[in-house]
C-alpha cells in the first residue's frame, strides 16, 4: 500500500510503499531506488538512501522516519545532502483521504454472485439498466408474493442500499447509484476506491444495519396493528439481510470478515479467527441451520485461499480495536436478524416459518 507521497522531491515525485509484513519500496519518478525486505528488521524505524547524478556531482538523498501500524502513524524526514527539505507525519485519516498514485489492480475472485456484480459494474454507465432491474425485481417478488408486498420489500432493499450510500458519503466518496438484482438484493456503486479496511467494514456493514432497522420498524408496526403484512415484511427482509452477511465475496459479510482476517498478522489472531469460524459452523449445524452452516464453510474456504495474499493489498489494515469492534458488530447483526426470524417462526404461521425452513434446508 502507498504510505507516503512527496509530489516534489528534486522536481519528481517520491513515493514510499510498504506492507504489514515489513517490506518497503521507495520510488523516485516511478523508478525503484531503495527497498527493505520483510525480514530485514522488526524495528519501526526505517532508513532509505539513494544517489542521483547531476552532471559531475553526486546528490545524496535520504528518507528516514518511524512507522507504527497499530495505530497507524508514520513520521518522516526527506533529506538532500543532509539538509531537510520535507518532514511531517501521516495517520489513518490521511490514508482514508488519499488518492493512490499508482493504478490498483482489481482482486481476482471467482464467484457466481461475483460475476453478477462484475456484469453490473460493466453496465453501470447505462441509466436504463436501473429501470430494467427494478422492474425485474418487482416482477420476481410479485410472482412469489403479492404486488403490494413486492413493492414494500423493494422499499426495504432500497433502504438497505441507502445504508451503503450513506457510509460512502460519510467517507467523502461519490456514489454512482443503486441497482436492484432479483432474488439477490441490490448493489450500491461508487466511482472511487477505498483505502482502508475500516472503510470496507463500515460501508459493507451499514447496509445490513439499515436492513435490521427496517425489520425492527416493521416488527413494531406488526405489534401495534396486528397486520400479517408487516410481520411478513419484517421476517423476509431479515432473511435477505442475513444472506448478505454470509462470508462470501462480494456479499457484505464477505467484505467484513475478509477485512478482519486480513488485518491479523499474529499467530494468536489467526487461531482466534479460525476458532470463531469453526464455532460459527458448529453453532449453525447444532441449531439446525444447515444451509447457513454450509455457506459459512464455503465462504471461509474462499477467504482462507486468499489470506496469504493479504500483504499485497493496498488497504490499510484494521488495528486491534478495529478488529474486535468489527467482529462484535458483525456477530451482533447476525444474532439480531436470526432473532427476528426465530421470533416469527415461533408464531406457528406457515409463511412466517418459511425463512427458518430455508436456513435449515
Give residue ranges: language-model regions.
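Amphipathic alpha-helical segments
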Residues: 26-33
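Hydrophobic transmembrane alpha-helices and their immediate loop junctions
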Residues: 2-13, 18-23, 36-56, 64-361
Amino acid at each position: 500500500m502507498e504510505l507516503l507521497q512527496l509530489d516534489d522531491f528534486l522536481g519528481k515525485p517520491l513515493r514510499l510503499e510498504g506492507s504489514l509484513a515489513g517490506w518497503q519500496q521507495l520510488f523516485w519518478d516511478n523508478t525503484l531506488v531503495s527497498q527493505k525486505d520483510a525480514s530485514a528488521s522488526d524495528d519501526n524505524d526505517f532508513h532509505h538512501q539513494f544517489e542521483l547524478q547531476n552532471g559531475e556531482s553526486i546528490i545524496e538523498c535520504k528518507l528516514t522516519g518511524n512507522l507504527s501500524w497499530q495505530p497507524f502513524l508514520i513520521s518522516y524526514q526527506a533529506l538532500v545532502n543532509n539538509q531537510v527539505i520535507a518532514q511531517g507525519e501521516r495517520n489513518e485519516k490521511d490514508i482514508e483521504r488519499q488518492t493512490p498514485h499508482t493504478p490498483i489492480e482489481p482482486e481476482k475472485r471467482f464467484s457466481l454472485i461475483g460475476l453478477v456484480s462484475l456484469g453490473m459494474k460493466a453496465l453501470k454507465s447505462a441509466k436504463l439498466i436501473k429501470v430494467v432491474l427494478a422492474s425485474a425485481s418487482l416482477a420476481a417478488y410479485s410472482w412469489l408474493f403479492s404486488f403490494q408486498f413486492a413493492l414494500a420489500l423493494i422499499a426495504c432493499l432500497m433502504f438497505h442500499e441507502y445504508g451503503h450510500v450513506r457510509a460512502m458519503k460519510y467517507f467523502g466518496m461519490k456514489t454512482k447509484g443503486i441497482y436492484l438484482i432479483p432474488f439477490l438484493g441490490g448493489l450500491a456503486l461508487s466511482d472511487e476506491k477505498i483505502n482502508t479496511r475500516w472503510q470496507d467494514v463500515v460501508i459493507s456493514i451499514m447496509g445490513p444495519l439499515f436492513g435490521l432497522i427496517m425489520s425492527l420498524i416493521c416488527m413494531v408496526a406488526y405489534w401495534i396493528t396486528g397486520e400479517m403484512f408487516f410481520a411478513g415484511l419484517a421476517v423476509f427482509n431479515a432473511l435477505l439481510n442475513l444472506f448478505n452477511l454470509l462470508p462470501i465475496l462480494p456479499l457484505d459479510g464477505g467484505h467484513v470478515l475478509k477485512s478482519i482476517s486480513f488485518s491479523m498478522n499474529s499467530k494468536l489472531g489467526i487461531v482466534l479467527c479460525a476458532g470463531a469460524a469453526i464455532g460459527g459452523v458448529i453453532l449453525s449445524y447444532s441449531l439446525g441451520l444447515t444451509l447457513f452452516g454450509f455457506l459459512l464453510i464455503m465462504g471461509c474456504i474462499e477467504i482462507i485461499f486468499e489470506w496469504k495474499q493479504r500483504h499485497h493489498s493496498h488497504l490499510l489494515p484494521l488495528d486491534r480495536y478495529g478488529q474486535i469492534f468489527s467482529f462484535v458488530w458483525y456477530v451482533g447483526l447476525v444474532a439480531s436478524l436470526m432473532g427476528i426470524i426465530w421470533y416469527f417462526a415461533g408464531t406457528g404461521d406457515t409463511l412466517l416459518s418459511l425463512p427458518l425452513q430455508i436456513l435449515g434446508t
